[in-house]
Amino acid sequence: TFDKKEFSALPTTESEFTITREAGTMTMKGKFEGNEGYGKFTFTENADFKTFLAKEGIEITKEHDMMMLFMGNINRDYVAFLKQNGYKDISKSKLVELGIHGLTKDVLTNYFSTFDKKGLTLSKLIELKIHGVNAQYKKSLNDAGFIDVPLQQIIEAKIHGINAEYLAD
């Protein structure tokens, strides 16, 4: 998703406008009516950001992957945040998945404070987000008396629709 403030302008007539992020620039040609727009777009990757990623050991070979990083608003600060939190070997596919699934720095920080960080691989973080496991869900299990439940069992409980109300029955 995009914040309205990211757009260079929202035209009411057929027009061209851009959104620029570290991964690149999306140029859109179209029209907005109210809060909805339609049209066509082109994406131009940012070669400097691509070079930065390569220096970080993340080799991007397809423009599509750069566009996915753009859509997830993945930037230098985000990559540095991952590395500062112990994720040294970040693959292109994991970085793309983190962006696609909306694992922002705030979401990750929440996971780090809620769950035992040593078990939180990038794959596990993505799995938590996909299945909607969060601090509130873990707290509801704790409040129902289920305190030292292993992370994988918490995920499985969420997948199978087990919640505090179910546990109270």
Regions found by a protein language model. Name each.
Residues 1-169:
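General marker for long, soluble alpha-helical cores
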